[in-house]
Curated annotation (Swiss-Prot):
Any one GO BP annotation for this protein: response to hydroperoxide
Family listed: Belongs to the UPF0246 family.
Gene Ontology cellular-component annotations: cytosol
Highest taxon of source: Bacteria
UniProt protein name: UPF0246 protein Daro_2893
Length: 257
């Protein structure tokens, strides 16, 4: 089973990593190609392209300028520890053991606009480049054109080595589209997290994002390599609801939040 996550806009490079193990992203050559193109943009260009405030645009202008190879623990950080925000708050990777992270390295993949696909312990330098950005490049009009075939090949190669090829999609549609817009050779299971509000169950973005991280953590600490074990997921009061689920969409609900 492969578990897909989105990256995060918020980054944490202040907290020292609690593990020394690291790996290198598989597509640094392609990342460098994108960085070279991004360096041609002014802060105003970046603000317009990514709909950022002037301070955020300047921050990322400087990030692109400072991005450099090779990646080392001195100038980069493991992806799962660098990404912050709702999903990663739920995952709480800073509290995972080295053995947990080793298991996550086999099961979890983070889709990225700059790095393509990341393993949790792959080193990354700070950046902002969402997969949905309409950033024209030699491959086409956007990052889906740039990454699509590469991601599909990488994912299918991993799935081909599994006795039961299955993807648990905990990434957003923006990121999953980069891979699933084409054909993944395996089952795809999409968890849906709903909370009770105003007399009915509904998806509440903040809670749903955090639940994606919680489910990833549940899979990691319980060493789940098959999706069926996730039906027992009960973190933060969520429970699987079979009567509103089907083979592809697994619904988890909670009454109180």
């Amino acid at each position: 089973m492969l578990i897909f996550l989105s990256p995060a806009k918020s980054l944490d490079y202040k907290t020292p990593p609690h593990v020394a193990t690291f790996t290198q992203p598989a597509y640094l050559k392609q990342s460098e190609t994108l960085i070279k193109q991004l360096r041609k943009l002014s802060p105003a260009d970046i603000a317009n392209l990514m709909h950022l405030s002037d301070p955020l645009a300047l921050l990322n202008f400087n990030r692109y300028a400072e991005w450099s190879l090779p990646f080392t623990p001195e100038n980069a950080k493991q992806a799962v520890l660098a990404f912050d925000g709702d999903v990663y708050d739920g995952l709480a990777a800073k509290n995972l053991t080295a053995d947990d992270l080793d298991f996550a390295q086999q099961q979890v993949r983070i889709l990225s606009g700059l790095y393509g696909i990341l393993k949790p312990l792959d080193l990354v330098q700070p950046y902002r480049l969402e997969m949905g950005t309409r950033f024209a490049n030699k491959a086409g009009k956007d990052l889906y054109a740039f990454w699509g075939e590469r991601l599909l090949e990488a994912i299918n190669a991993e799935l081909a080595g599994m006795s039961r090829p299955v993807v648990l999609n905990l990434a957003s549609e923006e990121y999953f589209k980069a891979a699933v817009g084409r054909k993944i050779n395996g089952e795809v299971i999409q968890p849906v997290f709903e909370d009770w509000k105003n007399g009915k169950y509904k998806i509440i973005s903040f809670y749903a994002k955090r639940a994606r991280g919680l489910m990833t953590r549940y899979a990691v600490v319980n060493r789940l390599s098959e999706p069926e074990g996730l039906k027992a997921f009960d973190y933060d009061g969520y429970a699987f609801v079979p009567e509103v689920s089907d083979d592809k969409s697994w619904v988890f609900r909670r009454r109180e939040s």
